[in-house]
């Protein structure tokens, strides 16, 4: 088990303790330590207030000081150090109206979401587990700390996080926790879609995504999410991990819709990937010749092509026609990509200026069409990517 990240952070805890305060590792890192999983991020909780943390360390960043969180920069790494706190009443099912700093570890841990995330550990690797988190981990159960309805009323995102953890960890959800989700799922409509998308992205990549996705449907979670709320998501099936962007593309192809993606507030890159996924899925079934395969590999991101091909079972489960394996497979994609004479239009040895000068013509719609014709001719091997050869080909094959 890799404990090196704990060791790297140990001097921070020791320095806090040397100044008379308590300090512990907490949250996901401790959960993963107990499970024997790789540890990625270290979170630290302490009885010291933010002001006291800033006085102890020379290099700090007040990233969320009003909520008790200070980033301590140590050996060029950022560590989140958060003061023990009790939270006041929540507003809009998503954030506390205020926080009160406390000096008691138990009081801090009891406000956390799930028992598996409410375990603290000191520098001697002693665990502080007031809510039987280790027992739930051993039994592979996700259970809220305390009363489930109260935890979900505080922050409705915890319901989506619960399903995300189920997908990632292949845990079951405690009956009382699941029933509270059933009665309170409508509260996710109060959340920002950005927070939901972050959780869905992780959920869709989890090893147990099929079960969690089915729970999203049975709990009617999609009814309260922008974009998805207008669709019958019960018709969508996910049988293995895929990107969220691919899911959205599958939905678009399955229902033959062209809804705006703006309600999901995705990045430009995500929108671009979704549109490419749609084009790839529409193009795949019609590829029957080597020339078509060359243009297909040239026109689209090969990583996205491979993602679609690997997800063939998901496409089939949604009645979307896939590729012809004898013509299009991972090997032929790689071989075709390797043999392409160029990989984008910037590699082409002529441009619009050269063509206008050669043909003594002004710019117009013809130019875009001609550049595409040349592109196709080069990629499919009809002409070599050399200026003189291209211009000869233009003279012999093109009329404007």
UniProtKB/Swiss-Prot annotation:
UniProt-listed SUPFAM superfamilies: Nucleotidyltransferase, Poly A polymerase C-terminal region-like
Positions of ATP binding: 28, 31, 112, 155, 158, 161, 164
Family: Belongs to the tRNA nucleotidyltransferase/poly(A) polymerase family. Bacterial CCA-adding enzyme type 3 subfamily.
Entry binding sites for CTP: 28, 31, 112, 155, 158, 161, 164
Signal peptide residues on this chain, from the entry's feature table: none
Miscellaneous information on this protein: A single active site specifically recognizes both ATP and CTP and is responsible for their addition.
Gene encoding the protein: cca
Enzyme class: transferase
Positions of Mg(2+) binding: 41, 43
A molecular-function term among this protein's GO annotations: ATP binding
Designated name of the protein: CCA-adding enzyme
Keywords, sorted A to Z: ATP-binding, Magnesium, Metal-binding, Nucleotide-binding, Nucleotidyltransferase, RNA repair, RNA-binding, Transferase, tRNA processing
Annotated EC: 2.7.7.72
Co-factor(s): Mg(2+)
């Amino acid at each position: 088990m890799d404990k090196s990240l704990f060791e790297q952070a140990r001097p921070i805890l020791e320095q806090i303790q040397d100044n008379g305060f308590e300090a512990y590792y907490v949250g996901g890192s401790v959960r993963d330590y107990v499970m024997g999983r790789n540890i990625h991020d270290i979170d630290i909780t302490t009885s010291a207030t933010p002001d006291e943390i800033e006085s102890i360390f020379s290099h700090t960043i007040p990233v969320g000081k009003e909520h008790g969180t200070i980033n301590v920069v140590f050996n060029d790494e950022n560590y989140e150090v958060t003061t023990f706190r009790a939270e006041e009443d929540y507003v809009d099912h998503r954030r506390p109206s205020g926080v009160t700093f406390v000096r008691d570890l138990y009081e801090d841990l009891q406000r956390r979401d799930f028992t598996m995330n409410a375990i603290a550990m000191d520098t001697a690797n002693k665990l502080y587990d007031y809510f039987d988190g280790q027992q739930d981990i051993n039994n592979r159960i996700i259970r809220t700390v305390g009363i489930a309805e109260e935890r979900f009323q505080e922050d409705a995102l915890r319901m989506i996080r619960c399903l995300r953890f189920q997908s990632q960890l292949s845990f079951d959800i405690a009956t009382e926790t699941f029933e509270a989700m059933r009665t309170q799922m409508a509260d996710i409509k109060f959340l920002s879609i950005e927070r939901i998308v972050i959780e869905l992205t992780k959920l869709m990549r989890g090893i147990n995504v099929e079960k969690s996705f089915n729970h999203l449907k049975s709990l009617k979670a999609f009814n309260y999410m922008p974009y998805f709320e207008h669709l019958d998501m019960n018709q969508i099936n996910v049988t293995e991990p895929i990107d969220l962007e691919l899911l959205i593309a599958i939905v678009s192809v399955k229902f033959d819709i062209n809804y705006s993606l703006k309600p999901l507030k995705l990045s430009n890159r995500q929108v671009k990937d979704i549109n490419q996924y749609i084009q790839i899925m529409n193009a795949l079934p019609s590829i029957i010749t080597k020339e078509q395969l060359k243009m297909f590999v040239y026109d689209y991101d090969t990583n996205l092509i491979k993602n679609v091909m690997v997800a063939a079972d998901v496409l089939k489960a949604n009645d979307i026609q896939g590729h012809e394996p004898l013509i299009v497979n991972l090997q032929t994609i790689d071989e075709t990509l390797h043999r392409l004479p160029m990989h984008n239009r910037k590699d082409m040895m002529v441009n619009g200026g050269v063509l206008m000068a050669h043909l003594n013509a002004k710019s117009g719609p013809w130019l875009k069409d001609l550049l595409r014709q040349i592109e196709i001719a080069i990629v499919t091997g009809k002409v070599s990517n050399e200026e003189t050869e291209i211009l000869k080909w233009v003279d012999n094959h093109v009329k404007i």
